[in-house]
């Protein structure tokens, strides 16, 4: 059997110990549970409400007690063998003798969900709805239908009878209320009760339970930020846990934390404000349809809340915040300069009574200068090992001085250049953006320094203004877009005299010589996806050509685990959502998960994992925020790079997505993200750049949306001049599935593969008219073949 056999023959080849499968294995489930426990964030713990003392009697409330949301919908959904909900987790703790569960409340919800579930649309009914939706042009009505359809797939919160609450209070010591939210690809959330805000039924439940019980714990089971104001300061709510979406073991991991088997060490990857309206872009996100004006510019998330006057008071829980069951002490903090880097060190000591982990966060403050800067920007971070009481660990952090440079897109100092402005740069080290101490060392420049000269790329032409650090706005130049495109050099090689198969590339023939054997029609077919891949593949494949024995590369979703159709009968591991993983601040753990997920793809004869996803949490209502890591590009980029390293250690290609500015789902195929070059460089592209430079992803997926008037999949400036020429990306670029742009324009831009299907007739016409050349096609084909060689190693 040749080395490409796994792409041609589809039986699962177990990769585990003793011939066992790793896909959906107990070992992977345990890893998922461990990760979930490390990323859940303890937001409140008054009077040491948690962990529960052994023998505590608990009563469980909220329909999410049994209808636990393991992850979001769409490409991020995962078919797994089971999902352990909150009730399951506490029954396990009861079996272990740690708590006593008052079962009637949980059984009430179990029966309610069962009965209400009968009214949930069947698969056939949902398919009819999608047929109707797909036939419509995008409009608000279509958006509402999609939203209502997803909402109908989960039951509403139940009204718990007062009598049952009273009975529970008489038989339990503490109440645990779990509130859940679901979101999905294709539609955004809404700033309404039952979504971003609590519903009246949820408020009533909290009111009645907190009156009946002396103490209450609230667990939030959501992939993105929800409003916490209704209960944050309620004195009867002793503890709050943001549990995110914890994958197939999320309920068990929640019980682990509440019962003290795991000490929470998650820290927020997003700011949680006092209301949705606290976001600078709140109304613009709700009303924008054909375009979104990114007038908040670089002031996204904590960069806005910690900088702009009056915004700080709008924060409930700051970026990087999270509590522990123990206390930590920082000592011996040092900061200085060495070999073009800022270096810092600190010793962290556990001064509490139980083992725990702490996150050390290093921020810098740059001089405002002519360009204006956020008050704080995350520069580096590290997480300690599990420290026993009294144990210490010394951590070293560093980052390049050039990382503090700002992009001057208007020429205030040097146009289209990264600039370090003169003045004093200070450094702040601590456990959240607000819980820091200013270090003694300052990096001082007497003159402005040009770090790197670039060029104007993806320039906005219709964004009229942007926010400044003092809360005012500056006008931006407008005009007509100018789109650049280049030419691809012809491959200098000759085809062999006789046909040579792909198996011999690198042995008897070079890759360039091999490509010269392709006919034009074969080149055209090769740069488009196809859906006839056998086996468990359900998102199609690309590449593959029987005549020359080139194997296809089967693809698979998605960011929260290998997504296979239930009809395959192959349950996989549902990992915690990306936001939870970012809240671990543990890149080693994320890399371990990437490797485990990559092994599941390899075992099932797949080649490309359409993950991880890495767009910025600009607004909490984006329907796919659960797929993305953070509001901060450094944290997102480091998490993404770790995931990619893990995935590709298994010889599976990671496909980092969605490149770029895919920050909303409504009208996602045609919505234009109007954003300044500076915000693009410093916020929305920064995480991708970190991943490219640190992890060398083998593929990147362009997004559906437009950036400043151009679909990303046809943007030569984005895909070639910036991604390849500036960052040095060597891999292949694929479109997202069904993007609304011309295949020939994509080839010219440097987008190598059109998925899920190509447009061979359009490409052939473009070739015959001279719009594209054989050299253009060969360039993309070569990148696909180089990818194939990497995956097949």
Model-derived features: where do they sit?
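Short beta-strand edge segments in extracellular beta-sheet folds
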Residues: 442-452
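Glycoside hydrolase catalytic-domain context in secreted enzymes
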Residues: 1-435, 451-793
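Extracellular and select intracellular beta-sandwich modules with Ser/Thr-enriched
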Residues: 436-441
